[in-house]
Amino acid sequence: MAKKDQEFVKDITNMDEDFPQWYTDVITKTDLVDYSPVKGFMVIKPYGYAIWENIQAFLDRRFKETGHQNCYFPLLIPESLLNKEKEHVEGFAPEVAWVTHGGSEKLAERLCVRPTSETIICSMYSKWLTSYRELPYLYNQWCSVVRWEKSTRPFLRTSEFLWQEGHTLHETAEEAQAETLQMLAIYKEMAEDLLAIPVVDGRKSDRERFAGAAATYTIEALMHDGKALQSGTSHNLAQHFTKAFDITFQGRTGELEYPHHTSWGASTRLIGGIIMVHGDNRGLVLPPRVAPTQVVIIPIAQNKEGVLDKAYEIKKELEAKGIRVTLDDDTNYSPGWKFNQYEMKGVPLRLEIGPRDIENNVAMIARRDTLSKDSYSLDNIGDTVKNLLDTVHTDMLERARAHRDSKTFTFKDYEEFKRKMIETPGFAKGMWCGEEECEAKIKEDTGVTIRCIPFVQENLGETCQFCGKPAKHMVYLAKAY
């Protein structure tokens, strides 16, 4: 075996001893990404991109089912457009990358590489919209954005990342709010039904909301190490951008009106979430519905008569059920090496078939999530595997929920909160006064932020547990990626 192959299946860093190094080991050894010559710009390799494609497919289907259309807007945005919404430009100014020259000629106006597309899209909407009859505008684009980050980590925080961003216009405030919450619900559905990641949904505090938004809503997931990951956001932008960009339409009474505006997005950081919620010390553990390969078939003693034929027959039967299958008949590697390889890559099910199995009309199937292995009849193997994949998804979601709940705590006072955040980091549930000064002090003292004001509220007391003033909300707090 070549040295490179030996390195590939070698143990990775223990996640409980050095979680950041564990994460780096996993993303590189499983061939998800590589580092490019430009700091903060990652190369997403085919295996990593296939995961993104499955996320795309789920979201794209749900967007279209809810009436949205895909389109594409330019990468470069004139500085004058970016400056039109004051709060927005101030929020993004430190992260903007600028184009100053075209060839050797200096441009008359700087162009920013889009950090997000509200401004360029609103400039076009102002040209297009004339009447209430044209509303709503329900547009989405799949693209990359650039935010010049100082500290980067693949998938979690990179200077360039892939995402989708939806931008909609509505006749009324009520319709815009309904859209904002509908899209957040789709993100929650995606997290739980596709990625097997339980999330807390709610509203961001004013301090944490999107620059230029009236309100930002979020889904928050908890990683293995007790840090939170913002996994999708939906913004009610009210009329902030439509007024700044003079987007008007003739209303039902004949008067000119400003439409109500939303935007919402999810990105490749979701892949980082999958890794950190489900992974273990053997590598990736991929939820079946997002895994590029759901089942790998490994023939045992494949040189024996009938083994490969049966393996391909099983592959065909599984594919007929819509299951994504890889059959590894490469004779350069032993079955044991393949077992290690596909475990590290997180393939949900491994099906082994050899002469004795064929004789007994069975196959051995190993689950990546539990590392258990059992014998299953080859009769109706397609239905058996399909049901097993659903079981794996359900079990992974419930394990992740149990882990999150075990790392969610309440506290009697600020001192206990600070101590628990150091000793047993996770989600803290506490009562908060709603004041920005109090929130800023929490972050300054501890590095912890309010992740959201959850839709489902609990009354844990009448006073703010951080400053003693009357409490307005129960909030979730955590350190975050």
UniProtKB/Swiss-Prot annotation:
SUPFAM superfamilies: C-terminal domain of ProRS (SSF64586), Class II aaRS ABD-related (SSF52954), Class II aaRS and biotin synthetases (SSF55681). Homodimer. Pfam families: HGTP_anticodon (PF03129), ProRS-C_1 (PF09180), tRNA-synt_2b (PF00587). This is Proline--tRNA ligase. Gene3D superfamilies: Anticodon-binding domain, Bira Bifunctional Protein, Domain 2, C-terminal domain of ProRS. It is an enzyme of class 6 (ligase). Consists of three domains: the N-terminal catalytic domain, the anticodon-binding domain and the C-terminal extension. Catalyzes the attachment of proline to tRNA(Pro) in a two-step reaction: proline is first activated by ATP to form Pro-AMP and then transferred to the acceptor end of tRNA(Pro). Can inadvertently accommodate and process cysteine. Misacylated Cys-tRNA(Pro) is not edited by ProRS; this function may be provided by ProX. It is found in: Cytoplasm. Belongs to the class-II aminoacyl-tRNA synthetase family. ProS type 3 subfamily. Its EC number is 6.1.1.15. One of its GO terms (cellular component) is aminoacyl-tRNA synthetase multienzyme complex. The lineage of its organism: Bacteria, Bacillati, Bacillota, Clostridia, Peptostreptococcales. It catalyses: tRNA(Pro) + L-proline + ATP = L-prolyl-tRNA(Pro) + AMP + diphosphate. Its main location: cytoplasm. CDD domains: ProRS_anticodon_zinc, ProRS_core_arch_euk.
